[in-house]
Amino acid sequence: MSGKSPAQTRVVVGMSGGVDSSVTALLLKEQGYDVIGVFMKNWDDTDENGVCTATEDYKDVAAVADQIGVPYYSVNFEKEYWDRVFEYFLAEYRAGRTPNPDVMCNKEIKFKAFLDYAMELGADYVATGHYAQVRTDEDGTVHMLRGADNNKDQTYFLSQLTQEQLKKTMFPLGHLEKPEVRRIAEKAGLATAKKKDSTGICFIGEKNFKKFLGEYLPAQPGKMMTLDGVEMGNHAGLMYYTIGQRGGLGIGGQHGQLTSDPWFVVGKDLTTNTLYVGQGFHHEHLYSTSLDASDLSFTREMPETFDLHCTAKFRYRQEDTGVTIHVNGDKVTVDFDEPVRAITPGQAVVFYDGEECLGGAMIDVAYKEQKVMQYQ
């Protein structure tokens, strides 16, 4: 933290209209900071009935800001979001991958476009309602730690943040558990105290994912096959399926199958537009032993090349897995201590040293004993 007192320290809070960011603003105000609330409009989400959830969310921001006595603004990042997040989202699906727009949104919008805007407002820091913690060393190095609420920890989505971004960021909810955040909101009588949490990708909201994606990318139906070459039917388009997926295949008890085990997506081949399926949660083709990833970013300064044994997550809320990472610039090879199920190209692999989130990269390809897994 700077040598300024809280009263001299301006913190611009990203307020979404949800309970987490509302309590973030409240706590900072109670601690004596000079707080400004900012609502980011990242997507035109007007539905076919002319209803825009962003309008309702902004009303909630205004109500909470008025209640706690802080000024508030709205800023439009629709163009930045389209260019930096949505175009990436579509490009990944075109490439047969499964993107993670939340990771990209934090990297490009909430901690870049928003951070820049906050600095124009004279901010010393930005703050968000994410469940993560920061610890600063005497030399000024900032470490990003998991949130105290293990069920809500969001460091996975914040893994692409840089040291420069973290030095200007506060996470006031990091030491709290979610039920306590709700209690604080209710005790303060905040307008958002009972508002349910938003889930899913912000620009899709409650819409049907298949229908939404089909509006932007033409679906290309193709063959659904087993790895032995047995045809199992047709798929609706590779972009609608992810590695390890069970539902939506439409192949129940048929084709003289030998067991009653459910069917899963075990592979994709973009060149032939084939979806590969197999029976059993633990199908051998779902397991790999290493991966290559790119766009590697660390939360603090690291050497250009090094090897390290640490733990990793390959998706949100997954148990940590022991790994050895081999870093070369912005690329990394990750060897798993034991085989891992359903590694998904396009998703983030995030590295941890105990409680500290070291950073992350985007998965390009998975291997099983040096053999490329046909996952895209």
Swiss-Prot record:
SUPFAM superfamilies in the cross-refs: Adenine nucleotide alpha hydrolases-like
Gene3D superfamilies, A to Z: Adenine nucleotide alpha hydrolases-like domains, HUPs, Translation factors
Family the UniProt entry places it in: Belongs to the MnmA/TRMU family.
Positions marked as site (Interaction with tRNA): H130, Q347
Function: Catalyzes the 2-thiolation of uridine at the wobble position (U34) of tRNA, leading to the formation of s(2)U34.
Catalytic activity: S-sulfanyl-L-cysteinyl-[protein] + uridine(34) in tRNA + AH2 + ATP = 2-thiouridine(34) in tRNA + L-cysteinyl-[protein] + A + AMP + diphosphate + H(+)
A GO CC term attached to the entry: cytoplasm
Protein name: tRNA-specific 2-thiouridylase MnmA
Underlying gene: mnmA
Interaction with target base in tRNA: annotated segments: 100-102
Record key words, sorted: ATP-binding, Cytoplasm, Disulfide bond, Nucleotide-binding, RNA-binding, Transferase, tRNA processing, tRNA-binding
Record localization: Cytoplasm
Residues that hold ATP according to the record: G14, M15, S16, G17, G18, V19, D20, S21, M40, G129
Source organism (scientific name): Lactococcus lactis subsp. cremoris (strain MG1363)
Residues at the active site: C105 (nucleophile), C202 (cysteine persulfide intermediate)
Record region (Interaction with tRNA): 152-154, 315-316
Keyword check for RNA-binding: yes
Pfam families listed in its UniProt record: tRNA_Me_trans, tRNA_Me_trans_C, tRNA_Me_trans_M
InterPro entries assigned to the protein according to its UniProt record, in alphabetical order: MnmA-like (IPR004506), MnmA-like_C (IPR046885), MnmA-like_central (IPR046884), MnmA-like_central_sf (IPR023382), Rossmann-like_a/b/a_fold (IPR014729)
GO biological process terms, semicolon-separated: tRNA wobble position uridine thiolation
HAMAP family for this protein: tRNA_thiouridyl_MnmA (MF_00144)
EC number of this enzyme: 2.8.1.13
Signal peptide (UniProt feature, chain positions): none
Cystines in this chain: C105-C202
Any one GO molecular-function label of the UniProt entry: ATP binding
